[in-house]
Amino acid sequence: MWHNVGLTLLVFVATLLIVLLLMVCGWYFVWHLFLSKFKFLRELVGDTGSQEGDNEQPSGSETEEDPSASPQKIRSARQRRPPVDAGH
């Protein structure tokens, strides 16, 4: 009789461990493939590590360069345009 009870408990505990392991693995893969791309969810979880979707530092450096770089880009774009003929 004790053999049957022990076997039943072993199966029950093994099933719970397998289910928990699958849930943890599923969360890990979903987090890394999809959810970590959203800054809002990273802030909720408290993940401050650099992720693929985290572009704060490059965008911060670009915004500092934008005031000086954007007029040059506009000028170069205007210079490349062919002159418009008013007679046609």
UniProtKB/Swiss-Prot annotation:
Disulfide bonds: none annotated. The modification Phosphothreonine is found at residue 63. Residues 48-88 are annotated as: Disordered. The keyword Magnesium does not apply. Keywords: Membrane, Phosphoprotein, Transmembrane, Transmembrane helix. The chain crosses the membrane at residues 10-30. Belongs to the SMIM13 family. This is Small integral membrane protein 13. It comes from Mus musculus (Mouse). The gene is Smim13.
